Amino acid sequence: MTKQFNSNGRILFEGKSNIDNKDIVVIITGLDNKTSNKKTGDMLQTWILLRDHAPNTSHKNGLNKSVCGSCPHMGNRQNSCYVKWFQAPLQVWKSYKNNRYDYFKKSDLNLIKGRSLRLGSAGDPTVIDLKVWKPLLDVCKNHTGYTHQWRSNFAQQYKGIVQASCDSFQDYLLASGLGFKCFYVKHKDTKIDKKLFINCPASIEMGQKTECSICSLCSGSKRDIVINAHGSTAKYVALEV
């Protein structure tokens, strides 16, 4: 009997994490079905997960370091991570463990053409080598991506590809000094020099003028972006003076 794969996703990568050499997997989804995230719009999603550990429990007990690295929101630190690890990441991982996804083939690049791509819907895109993403980046319409690993040597190849995730103005100064374009998440009352940044056009404070799939400013090579912390995790972002 022929195995029935879930055609909405593919296994993009199986191998070792750049962070600690642990086994990880990267799954791409949205190949059949459009996504409905209000902020991002219709984008292909990529899930960077531990191969053999459920993502929700891995997040709670700190095992997610293999895919999240030094992200300050990794682990059970006040639950400040915006990713709902018990929702889509867990479902994707379960499908993977149940052998529901086929491997990504060269011919599947036709499914990427003209689509918007989100590098790291969960997990940090720099934990795998850029050469894995490159074929997709070469054919997609546009992409977004963010990394908290911008201090790490392995992440330097991603300059011009992803934004450095910055949790303070000091982070911004350091990351931009290394050559990264930045995505700075700040307390709503933290004052900034408006000449340095563009406010995220998809943010609540900017009236959600567009979607990430249309905007594509967060592609690592355009501008430094700032956004007010929002949602249930905003209370964990400190006011800077």
Name each model-derived stretch.
Residues 1-241:
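Class I S-adenosyl-L-methionine
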